[in-house]
């Protein structure tokens, strides 16, 4: 039976599965290898009852490895879930490649991850065997649940394999359309560029360290001639490459092209442009192998590294060249005028745990399904709000023991990520500063390191999302307390969210000083996550927007701005609406439109 983290699926309003793995009856066929690899097993993280681990296959030969297959067995430990491979067996275990990581080029490696239970033992390091392995070795690297080093973004991240697909985090734009009229693609479709020289597909890759990475482009070229591409990293400042993309014989026949590139530490914009008038082939996906990488931030592109083509007519082009300016749903719905103003969406309440699973084991996905469908149709990113919070969580958690709550938290995160794997950003933990609304139930489940454990789970099940520690007005109140809390999480978190409610009366200099201090001490990308100014006096609201918004937008370490509502009478803070229900703007909205939203 085949097991894959991507196989968890839950239709709306039905009983969720309580098993950790979903098994589907897919026969495993014999696989042929034309080379072999060194196979290693590494413990990433270990806690009192469980662990996470990576298995890495490194091709040290001169020929490619195709369709790998490996096995391992524990004495006492047992696997409970895994990602980036297809799994079978109940000890011994078997793992085979997924559609996008089945070929390992000479000198390159792939990794997949797993989580398990120790069953009273320590975390074991079993021998990895199989037709793909020329030597079976185990890693002596062990770590505890303490903060990981900067070489790994989190203890349970899958460091060396990243898949970027259309309409998901890290996919920035296509100069053309997203289509699904030719079979054989993965994900929701493929990128079909315009038939023009220079037509491009653009991705964002975040690397925790500078170095060599292997990019693999999956494509179909049903034409009679090559449709080669020019691959540019960060506008050419970090490399220009030519990618050969010969005909595949049919638009339903998919092949891969692999190229080694140099990425810099931090955000990298990767642009593949057509070198002929026919445009590019259909592009299914981009996979990245090597080092620790995750989906990058399309909205953080500077003018020096922004993409050159402006032929895209989709709404995603605004987000790819500038930081996004987003907003939330209105009374549980998305207004028809949303994308007229905003290019990022956050569900105000619909993605909170208490809204989705008010009754234990019964999910209400319908409102979120509508929001994600709208976002995909308009090619704008979604930020989930929020996984774990001391408010608006299911009341039935109060009746459970700590271990039972731990199981429920993992199932909630797992099932959300399985249903919405293209979630760009997640407020993983909300308002955890003491005195705000920390999640006591999570501390009961995981102990004092509960924040790190929740982020570990989010990394495991949503490996391509940007994971955010979000909190209330940390610009004005409990500023130092938030900094201390964020610093303590180290590399478990990807970014911090500054809600920015209640800034009325603060000067531009005061706001900038606070943001600078958070960046200087925490060193993580910043998102302004819930900005509003509540005042029925139009001029007071306008003056505060004019003071604060330029600071947010021009700050080099603020990657995006989300406002918390925009329709008068239908916002959380009274007086914070920006347009009337009929669309008439207040002065602050007119100023936003003229200076930012229509730029």
Curated annotation (Swiss-Prot):
SMART domains: CBD_II, Glyco_10. Disulfide bonds join 39-133. The keyword Ion transport does not apply. The keyword Disulfide bond applies. Residues 315-595 form the GH10 domain. One of its GO terms (molecular function) is endo-1,4-beta-xylanase activity. Pathway: Glycan metabolism; hemicellulose degradation. InterPro entries: CBD2 (IPR001919), CBM2/CBM3_carb-bd_dom_sf (IPR008965), CBM2_carb-bd_dom_sf (IPR012291), CBM2_CS (IPR018366), CBM6 (IPR005084), Galactose-bd-like_sf (IPR008979), GH10 (IPR044846), GH10_AS (IPR031158). Keywords: Carbohydrate metabolism, Cellulose degradation, Disulfide bond, Glycosidase, Hydrolase, Polysaccharide degradation, Signal, Xylan degradation. One of its GO terms (biological process) is xylan catabolic process. Residues 1-37 form the signal peptide. Its EC number is 3.2.1.8. Xylanase B contributes to hydrolyze hemicellulose, the major component of plant cell-walls. Belongs to the glycosyl hydrolase 10 (cellulase F) family. This is Endo-1,4-beta-xylanase B. It comes from Cellvibrio japonicus (strain Ueda107). The lineage of its organism: Bacteria, Pseudomonadati, Pseudomonadota, Gammaproteobacteria, Cellvibrionales.
């Amino acid at each position: 039976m085949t097991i894959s983290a991507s196989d968890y699926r839950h239709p709306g309003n039905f009983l969720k599965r309580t098993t950790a793995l979903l098994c589907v009856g897919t026969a495993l066929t014999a696989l042929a290898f034309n080379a072999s690899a060194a196979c290693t097993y590494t413990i990433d993280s270990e806690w009192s009852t469980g662990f996470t681990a990576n298995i890495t296959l490194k091709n040290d030969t001169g020929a490619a490895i195709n369709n790998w297959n490996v096995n391992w067995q524990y004495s006492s430990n047992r696997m409970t879930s895994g990602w980036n491979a297809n799994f079978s067996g109940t000890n011994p275990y078997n793992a085979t490649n997924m559609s996008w990581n089945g070929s390992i080029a000479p000198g390159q490696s792939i990794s997949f991850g797993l989580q398990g239970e120790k069953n009273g033992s320590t975390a074991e390091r079993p021998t990895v065997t199989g037709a793909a392995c020329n030597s079976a070795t185990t890693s002596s690297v062990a770590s505890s649940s303490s903060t990981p080093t900067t070489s790994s973004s989190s203890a349970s991240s899958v460091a060396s394999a990243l898949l970027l697909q259309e309409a998901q985090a890290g996919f920035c734009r296509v100069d053309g359309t997203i289509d699904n009229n030719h079979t054989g693609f993965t994900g929701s479709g493929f990128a079909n560029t315009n038939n023009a020289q220079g037509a491009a597909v653009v991705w964002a890759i975040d690397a925790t360290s500078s170095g060599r990475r292997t990019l693999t482009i999956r494509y179909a070229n049903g034409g009679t001639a090559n449709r080669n591409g020019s691959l540019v990293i960060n506008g050419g400042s970090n490399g220009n490459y030519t990618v050969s993309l010969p005909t595949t014989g049919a638009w339903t026949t998919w092949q891969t092209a692999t190229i080694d590139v140099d990425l810099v530490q931090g955000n990298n914009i990767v642009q593949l442009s057509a070198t002929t008038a026919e445009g590019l082939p259909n592009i299914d996906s981009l996979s990245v192998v090597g080092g620790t990488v995750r989906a990058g931030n399309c909205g953080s592109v500077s003018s020096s590294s922004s993409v050159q083509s402006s032929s895209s007519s989709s709404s995603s082009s605004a987000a790819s060249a500038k930081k996004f300016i987003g907003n939330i749903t209105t009374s549980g719905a998305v207004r028809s005028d949303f994308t007229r103003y905003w290019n990022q969406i956050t569900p105000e309440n619909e993605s909170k745990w208490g809204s989705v699973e008010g009754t234990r084991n019964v999910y209400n996905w319908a409102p979120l399904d509508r929001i994600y469908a709208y976002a995909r149709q308009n090619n704008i990113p979604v930020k989930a709000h929020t996984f774990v919070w001391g408010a608006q969580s299911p009341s039935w958690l109060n009746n459970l023991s700590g271990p039972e709550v731990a199981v429920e938290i993992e199932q909630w995160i797992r099932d959300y990520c399985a249903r919405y794997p293209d979630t760009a950003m997640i407020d993983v933990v909300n308002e955890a500063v003491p005195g705000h609304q920390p999640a006591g139930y999570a501390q009961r489940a995981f102990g004092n390191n509960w924040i790190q454990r929740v982020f570990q789970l989010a990394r495991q099940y949503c490996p391509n999302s940007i994971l955010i520690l979000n909190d209330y007005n940390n610009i004005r109140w409990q500023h130092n307390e938030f900094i201390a809390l964020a610093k303590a999480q180290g590399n478990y978190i990807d970014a911090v969210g500054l809600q920015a409610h209640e800034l009325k009366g603060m000067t531009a200099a005061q706001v900038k000083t606070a943001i600078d201090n958070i960046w200087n001490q925490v060193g993580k990308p910043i998102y302004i996550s819930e900005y509003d100014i509540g005042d029925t006096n139009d001029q007071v609201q306008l003056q505060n927007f004019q003071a604060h918004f330029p600071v947010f937008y021009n700050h080099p370490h603020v990657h995006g701005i989300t406002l918390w509502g925009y329709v008068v009478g239908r916002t959380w803070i009274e007086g914070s609406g920006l347009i009337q229900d009929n669309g008439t703007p207040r002065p602050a909205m007119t100023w936003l439109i003229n200076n930012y939203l229509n730029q």
